[in-house]
Design a protein with these regions (language model features):
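C-terminal "cap" of GNAT-fold acetyltransferases
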Residues: 84, 119-122, 126-130, 138, ...
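Conserved glycine-rich acetyl-CoA-binding loop
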Residues: 88, 92-106, 120, 126-134, ...
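Residue-level detector of beta-propeller blades
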Residues: 67, 143-146
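Acetyl-CoA-dependent GNAT
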Residues: 6-12, 17-96, 105-107, 111, ...
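Extreme N-terminal starter segment of soluble prokaryotic enzymes
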Residues: 1-2
Length: 169
């Protein structure tokens, strides 16, 4: 059974190991890191020192086979505790296709709504990242129709804004 626990600095080794290409890296973090590849120390430094770091909750998904995934939950607006945003969502690439991504996102939704009291959860996903988009929609998110363009390595990628509300449950 998949579970969530607080992220540990040592988890960065696993998270970074799942990022095999720059394309996957950019799907995962967009432009949050300037250079690829990054090290576990780079990830932990970002988590410790980025603006608003105290308002971000990092989680590791695990099961009987070990660490399976990673997800962050943050308050995008300090004045709105009813809305949280997911980010840095990634699954162990060797364990994809088993429903673990959807299970992890659903656990994070449950935590967000039942523990944090959020009424709305948002996430951005690149349209080009079709497996992630399918996962989020299957977990209960819906497309808001809002699209933001990113320039990634000379290509224009469309970031779709998705949301989940308690009414969607």
């Amino acid at each position: 059974m998949l579970r969530l626990r607080p992220y540990r600095r040592s988890d960065a080794v696993n998270v970074i190991s799942w990022i095999k290409t720059e394309r996957i890296f950019r799907f995962w973090c967009a432009d949050r890191f300037e250079n690829y590849p990054i090290t576990p120390d780079d990830l932990n430094d970002q988590y410790d020192n980025s603006e608003g770091a105290e308002d971000v909750f990092h989680f590791t998904a695990y099961d009987e086979q070990g660490i399976a995934g990673h997800i962050n939950i943050r308050f995008p607006d300090k004045n709105d505790i009813d809305t949280v945003r997911f980010g840095y969502v990634i699954l162990d690439d060797s364990r994809r296709g088993q429903g673990l991504g959807k299970a992890m996102v659903r656990l994070a939704l449950k935590y967000s709504t039942e523990i944090m009291g959020a009424e709305k959860v948002t996430i951005g996903v690149f349209a080009e990242n079709e497996p992630a988009l399918r996962c989020y929609l299957a977990a209960g998110f819906r497309d808001t129709g809002v699209v933001e363009e990113y320039s990634i390595n000379g290509e224009v990628w469309n970031c779709l804004e998705l949301e989940y509300t308690c009414q969607d449950a």
